[in-house]
């Protein structure tokens, strides 16, 4: 009898100890200052914004200002590239595509116009060497009076756009590479780009409010619209090693490949002002590395106010989501938000 009582007491003690540990762990996450900072930044964020923080399988902080919620759909501009790069890597995972494949393997017209050496990797890292408009000017590039399909647009890129440098050598942040890779995927799979994105990325990730603007020609570099909740599902998948709700979307190897720097500062010729000094990986920018040079923090800011960030060392993701350009222009404010989050999520990150 005494032994049973002792055993029961020990079990209860373990349970209580676990619950106390759990409560203490959660009590350490006090985001009061973060919420106050968001409120104080209302004007700087254009009056409307959402901030979400995700860690350990759940959203641990959520706050909205103005008439804007985590479900509100808004343009995400260049944050679209992260989605497109992930879609590309899903085909690499299956062995249907290699990052070292030449674009001309799928689009022979590129060889005809001396662009046959451009690779898939060059396309998703802005290293094609082809002249092109900036991300924000895609609408002019896809003028419906001029192009009626992605096929026509990409053929025009191959035949009329000038090669300014050899592929793989100079970084120019524009729409060209992502436009080309979207057409490569269409040829490879005999499906429309948006259909493939839905089948492999947005639908499995329950991104129900994520789609593309109905331009005559789809914009795989900056034409998506999404919501804070939706995009956080995407970030959580990457943070969790490619798995979402128990289903594998990407391999861990694919995610690691996407995080590797593809540029050095000496290679960068054209880049957004807010990202000067940053190196590009694939679909994302490198915002932090460890003492060995391994990428630890990545982000993919969009012109229209989306700031998605993953800190792999501290194992959290956060997003600032707005319907306007104010947030995208304020990198110092975004850095201050991250600093306040880091203060609560302590880790030995160097």
Please state what every model-predicted region is.
Residues 82-87, 179-183, 233:
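Short amphipathic alpha-helical face segments that pack within enzyme cores
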Residues 137-229:
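Catalytic-site signature segments of enzymes, centered on catalytic residues
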Residues 65-68, 214-216:
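Short glycine/proline- and charge-enriched loop/turn segments
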Residues 1-29:
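Bacterial Sec-dependent N-terminal signal peptides
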Residues 39, 43-47, 67-173, 191:
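Active-site-proximal loop and beta-strand segments within enzyme catalytic domains
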Residues 28-63, 186-191, 195, 199, ...:
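Catalytic loop of the DD-peptidase/beta-lactamase superfamily, centered on the K-T-G motif
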Residues 60-61, 111-118, 129-136, 194, ...:
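Secretory-pathway/luminal and periplasmic proteins that interact with or process carbohydrate-rich
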